[in-house]
């Protein structure tokens, strides 16, 4: 269990060389990167050191979408689109589609929690109920912007946006205590309620265990598995968990 994405933000007036070096360092983590960058030249330099890992370039808006589209298309990466409101987001997304780019994600983050929630729900509703394909892309919700510094609030909002249509959720940090309920919640969202939550029977090596490691066993009920495996991983002892 780990953070699957790393968001690397490029603030206004950031130094291109420093940002590129930070992106290169983040790429070494082996996680998918999301580059929050609105400057086409800086974005191009950053993508040069990480494009093979297929990052997301989150930086297109009404003022720069043509240049950002050219950068993203050349690198073959997903382009994130934002707008000052839903109308601008829609128009910019439609303009990118006319340029032939449908490899997009929508940044639905607003000025505050209320606006962000409304944006995210309305975008998904337009795609599903109104069959509007222009809003039929995954969404990014940046909790750092709407709850900066409040880690507990970010964790609470992450649970809400997991259920209410956030495809990529950006937080300042992810501790084990925050990750466990959030990952369990995400798993439940994509679980068939008519089927019991079970773990596939098999042998699960923990902490670098090999064939000579200690063997322990537990039942296949998913909640039990996650509780037991979490405790065993924290012990640091190499062992094989048999389900």
Residue ranges and their predicted role:
Residues 1-94, 99-243:
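Conserved mixed alpha/beta catalytic, RNA-binding, or beta-rich assembly cores of soluble enzyme
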């Amino acid at each position: 269990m780990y953070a699957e994405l790393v968001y690397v933000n490029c603030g206004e007036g950031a130094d291109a060389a420093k940002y590129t070096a930070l992106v290169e360092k983040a790429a070494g983590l082996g996680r998918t990167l999301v580059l929050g960058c609105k400057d086409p030249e800086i974005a191009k330099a950053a993508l040069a050191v990480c494009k093979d890992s297929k990052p997301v370039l989150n930086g297109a808006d009404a003022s720069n979408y043509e240049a950002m589209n050219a950068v993203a298309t050349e690198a073959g990466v997903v382009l994130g689109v934002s707008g000052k409101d839903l109308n601008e987001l829609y128009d910019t997304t439609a303009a990118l589609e006319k340029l032939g780019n449908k490899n997009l994600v929508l940044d639905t983050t607003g000025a505050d929690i209320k606006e962000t929630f409304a944006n995210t729900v309305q975008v998904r509703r337009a795609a599903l109920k109104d069959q509007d394909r222009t809003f039929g892309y995954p969404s990014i919700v940046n909790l750092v912007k709407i709850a900066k510094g409040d880690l507990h609030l970010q964790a609470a909002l992450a649970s809400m946006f997991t259920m209410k249509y956030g495809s990529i959720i950006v937080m300042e940090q992810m501790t084990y205590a925050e990750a466990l309920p959030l990952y369990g919640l995400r798993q439940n969202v994509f679980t068939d309620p008519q089927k019991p939550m079970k773990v596939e029977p098999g042998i699960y090596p923990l902490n670098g265990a090999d064939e000579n490691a200690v063997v322990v066993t537990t039942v296949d009920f998913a909640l039990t598995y996650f509780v037991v495996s979490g405790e065993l991983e924290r012990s640091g002892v190499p062992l094989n968990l048999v389900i």
